[in-house]
């Protein structure tokens, strides 16, 4: 049996540029609102999204980790402010969200991402472990995955240990036999380290580590190097 028994993998900014993806999805959403709900469009574009988000979370703090439902509630609130009745407001919000969500899952993979997923999935069970709301089927990565853990499912976000434990428990694997791969030093690397996982820092920007930063087990600056980094960790383990 392989000494390494599980790979957990961050998605946003590890496999694709999430900021670029969200900007494109927002443009699609705004165009849809302008055509299908002009009064709501005026309210949406004249307000800061972060402000709308915080206003919604003040009323429904339980949505903090469920980004899809949070956005639906934000859009529902905008529709109500535009004087749509509750039923129509909800229907329009859900239709608007679907436009946004289609764009949110229209990702442009970083070079080597799919090849890396293919290589890892042939050797190990791979679980997505994400604070975001990307749909693994709609992004096209589900064939490479044995499971997917999201913050909405757990009710917490990385680096909360419950996120990592959810993957370990679902896979039936202990932390010392797992590698977590991600781009975020705090959410991914520190979080993995706290529960005893090995880690690979995806440092595509080639950033320098500061004194207070966590130290990953391995570091890569391109996704094509991940397979070798995983092998190095595997070889370092005792049976």
Please identify what each model-predicted range represents.
Residues 2-111:
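N-terminal helical cap/lid subdomain that shapes the substrate entry/recognition surface
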Residues 1-7, 19, 35, 87-89, ...:
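Asp-based, Mg2+/Mn2+-dependent phosphohydrolase catalytic module
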């Amino acid at each position: 049996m392989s000494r390494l028994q599980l790979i957990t993998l961050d998605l946003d900014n590890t496999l694709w540029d999430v900021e670029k993806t969200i900007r494109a999805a927002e443009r699609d959403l705004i165009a849809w609102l302008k055509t299908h709900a002009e009064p709501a469009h005026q309210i949406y574009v004249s307000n800061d999204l972060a402000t709308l988000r915080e206003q919604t979370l003040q009323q429904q703090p339980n949505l903090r980790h469920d980004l899809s439902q949070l956005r639906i509630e934000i859009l529902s609130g905008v529709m109500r402010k535009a004087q749509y009745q509750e039923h129509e407001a909800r229907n329009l919000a859900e239709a608007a969200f679907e436009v946004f969500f289609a764009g949110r899952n229209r990702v442009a993979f970083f070079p080597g991402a799919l090849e890396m997923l293919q290589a890892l999935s042939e050797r190990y069970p791979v679980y997505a472990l994400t604070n975001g709301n990307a749909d693994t089927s709609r992004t096209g990565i589900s064939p490479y995955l044995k499971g997917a853990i999201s913050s909405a499912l757990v009710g917490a976000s990385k680096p909360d240990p419950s996120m990592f434990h959810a993957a370990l428990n679902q896979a039936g694997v202990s932390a010392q036999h797992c590698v977590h791969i991600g781009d975020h030093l705090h959410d991914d690397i520190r979080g993995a380290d706290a529960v005893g996982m090995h880690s690979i820092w995806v440092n595509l920007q080639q950033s320098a580590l500061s004194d207070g930063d966590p130290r990953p087990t391995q570091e890569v600056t391109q996704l094509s190097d991940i397979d070798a980094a995983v092998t190095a960790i595997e070889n370092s383990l005792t049976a």
